[in-house]
C-alpha cells in the first residue's frame, strides 16, 4: 500500500459530499468538523422543524434529536414539507428522522416521541449542544428557555404566523438575554394566536426554519456573527426583513439573573394559564341555557320560519364555507359596532326573539354572545356548541374542515 503524499484536513468522502460548503469563507474544514461533532435537539417536528432538520442533516450535523409526540395529518402537508401523503397518521418525530437518514445516512438521529414537560426536559436536553425551539405555544417556549439556561445550552428560537416570522438566539454569550429576560410574564392566553387559528403560509415557516438551521451552523462553527442579542423580523407580504437589537441580559431575571429564583423546571401550564400544546381548547364561557348543539340547530333551521344566524369568523374563513343563512359579522365588529348598526346588519327587528351565533370551533361565538347580550339585550342570542367543526363532524361531513 502506497503511503500518502498529501495532508488531508478532512476525509475524502466528506470532502466530496460537503465540497460546496467547505469552500465558504469562515466555515470551511473547521466549521464542517465542528458541525459533525455537534449534537442538536429540535423541539417540534412541524413547519419549522422540517426545514431545520432537513438542512442540518444535509449539512452533516453529527447528531440530530427530534422531540414531538404528534402525528402527521393532512392539514400539515402544505407547510411541513418533509412529509408525504402516505405518511398521514404516522409519528412526526420518527418520520422526520427517517427523512434525514434517507438524505444523509451519516447523521445519527435520536427520536423522542414524547410530550416535552418539566419531568423529562432536563434528561433529554442534557445530551445536546444546541437546542432549536420550533414549537407553537407559550408554555413550551418558557420550558425550553429555562432548561437551556439551567444546562447552559444556546437556544435558537423561531416562530411564524400568517405572513410574518421572527428569529433570535437566546442565552449565547455573557450579555445575551434569555427569552424570560425579555418576557418575564406570559401573555394572557386569550390574546395568543397560533397557526391553527391564525393560519400561516408554507414559505414563511420554510424561510424561518432555514434561517434557524443557518444560526445553528454558525454557532457550531463558533462564529461570532449570530443573532444572539438580536431579533430578526421577516415580513413575507412585503418581502422585507429587519433586525433589531434586544436589551442585554437582565441581572434580575428569574432564571438567568444574578440571583435566580428558578433553579429547576416549574409547572409551566400553571405559570402560563394554558396547556403546553398548540391544540385549541374548548372554552365554557356561557350557561348551558344559552347554548344549543348542532343537532338542535339542525332541527331549528328545518322549521319554516326565518332563521337568524350570525357568523363571527373573519372574511377569509367565511369565504371557505358557510351555511346559506349566515350573516358575516366578525367578533371584532361585535365589539366595535353600536347596537343600531348591529341590528341593521343582522336584519332583526322588535319581533325577533332568537339569533344563533356560530364560529369555527365554538369559542369566539361564546365571546360574541356575551358582547351582543350587553348591546341588544332584548334579543336572545344563542351559541352553537362546537361551531362549524362540530357541524362538519356530526351533521354534514361534506362541509369543508380546515
From Swiss-Prot:
SUPFAM superfamilies according to UniProt: Activating enzymes of the ubiquitin-like proteins
Active-site residues, record numbering mapped to chain: 195 (glycyl thioester intermediate), 359 (cysteine persulfide intermediate)
Gene Ontology MF, one: nucleotidyltransferase activity
Binding site for Zn(2+): 178, 181, 253, 256
Any single GO CC term annotated in Swiss-Prot or TrEMBL for this entry: cytosol
Keyword set, alphabetical order: ATP-binding, Cytoplasm, Metal-binding, Molybdenum cofactor biosynthesis, Multifunctional enzyme, Nucleotide-binding, Nucleotidyltransferase, Transferase, tRNA processing, Zinc
Boundaries of every Rhodanese domain copy: 303-400
The keyword Metal-binding is assigned to this record: yes
Pfam families hit by this protein: Rhodanese (PF00581), ThiF (PF00899)
Subcellular location: Cytoplasm, Cytosol
Pathway per the UniProt entry: tRNA modification; 5-methoxycarbonylmethyl-2-thiouridine-tRNA biosynthesis; Cofactor biosynthesis; molybdopterin biosynthesis
A GO BP annotation: protein urmylation
Function as written in the Swiss-Prot or TrEMBL entry: Plays a central role in 2-thiolation of mcm(5)S(2)U at tRNA wobble positions of cytosolic tRNA(Lys), tRNA(Glu) and tRNA(Gln). Also essential during biosynthesis of the molybdenum cofactor. Acts by mediating the C-terminal thiocarboxylation of sulfur carriers URM1 and MOCS2A. Its N-terminus first activates URM1 and MOCS2A as acyl-adenylates (-COAMP), then the persulfide sulfur on the catalytic cysteine is transferred to URM1 and MOCS2A to form thiocarboxylation (-COSH) of their C-terminus.
Protein family membership: In the N-terminal section; belongs to the HesA/MoeB/ThiF family. UBA4 subfamily.
Protein name: Adenylyltransferase and sulfurtransferase MOCS3
Organism this protein belongs to: Caenorhabditis briggsae
Amino acid at each position: 500500500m502506497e503511503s500518502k503524499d498529501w495532508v488531508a484536513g478532512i476525509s475524502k468522502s466528506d470532502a466530496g459530499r460537503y465540497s460546496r460548503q467547505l469552500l465558504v469563507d469562515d466555515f470551511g474544514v473547521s466549521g464542517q468538523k465542528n458541525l459533525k461533532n455537534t449534537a442538536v435537539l429540535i423541539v417540534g417536528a412541524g413547519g419549522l422543524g422540517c426545514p431545520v432538520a432537513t438542512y442540518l442533516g444535509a449539512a452533516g450535523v453529527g447528531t440530530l434529536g427530534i422531540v414531538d409526540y404528534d402525528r402527521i395529518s393532512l392539514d400539515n402537508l402544505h407547510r411541513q414539507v418533509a412529509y408525504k401523503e402516505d405518511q398521514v397518521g404516522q409519528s412526526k418525530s420518527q418520520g422526520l428522522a427517517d427523512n434525514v437518514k434517507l438524505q444523509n445516512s451519516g447523521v445519527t438521529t435520536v427520536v423522542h416521541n414524547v410530550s416535552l414537560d418539566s419531568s423529562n426536559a432536563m434528561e433529554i436536553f442534557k445530551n445536546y449542544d444546541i437546542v432549536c425551539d420550533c414549537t407553537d405555544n407559550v408554555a413550551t417556549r418558557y420550558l425550553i428557555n429555562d432548561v437551556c439556561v439551567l444546562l447552559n445550552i444556546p437556544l435558537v428560537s423561531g416562530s411564524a404566523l400568517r405572513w410574518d416570522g421572527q428569529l433570535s438566539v437566546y442565552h449565547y454569550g455573557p450579555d445575551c438575554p434569555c427569552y424570560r429576560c425579555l418576557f418575564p410574564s406570559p401573555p394572557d392566553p386569550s390574546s395568543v394566536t397560533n397557526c391553527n387559528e391564525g393560519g400561516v403560509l408554507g414559505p414563511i415557516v420554510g424561510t424561518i426554519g432555514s434561517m434557524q438551521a443557518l444560526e445553528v451552523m454558525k454557532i457550531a462553527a463558533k462564529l461570532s456573527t449570530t443573532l444572539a442579542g438580536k431579533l430578526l423580523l421577516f415580513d413575507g407580504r412585503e418581502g422585507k426583513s429587519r433586525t433589531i437589537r434586544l436589551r442585554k441580559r437582565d441581572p434580575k431575571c428569574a432564571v438567568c439573573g444574578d440571583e435566580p429564583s428558578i433553579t429547576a423546571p416549574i409547572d409551566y401550564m400553571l405559570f402560563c394559564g394554558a396547556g403546553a400544546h398548540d391544540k385549541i381548547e374548548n372554552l365554557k364561557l356561557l350557561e348551558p341555557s344559552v347554548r344549543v348543539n348542532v343537532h338542535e340547530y339542525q332541527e331549528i333551521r328545518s322549521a319554516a320560519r326565518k332563521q337568524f344566524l350570525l357568523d363571527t369568523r373573519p372574511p377569509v374563513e367565511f369565504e371557505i364555507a358557510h351555511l346559506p343563512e349566515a350573516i358575516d359579522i366578525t367578533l371584532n365588529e361585535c365589539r366595535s359596532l353600536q347596537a343600531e348598526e348591529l341590528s341593521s346588519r343582522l336584519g332583526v327587528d322588535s319581533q325577533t326573539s332568537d339569533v344563533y351565533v356560530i364560529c369555527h370551533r365554538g369559542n369566539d361565538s361564546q365571546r360574541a354572545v356575551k358582547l351582543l347580550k350587553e348591546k341588544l339585550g332584548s334579543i336572545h342570542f344563542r351559541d352553537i356548541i362546537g361551531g362549524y367543526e362540530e357541524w362538519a363532524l356530526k351533521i354534514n361531513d361534506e362541509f369543508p374542515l380546515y
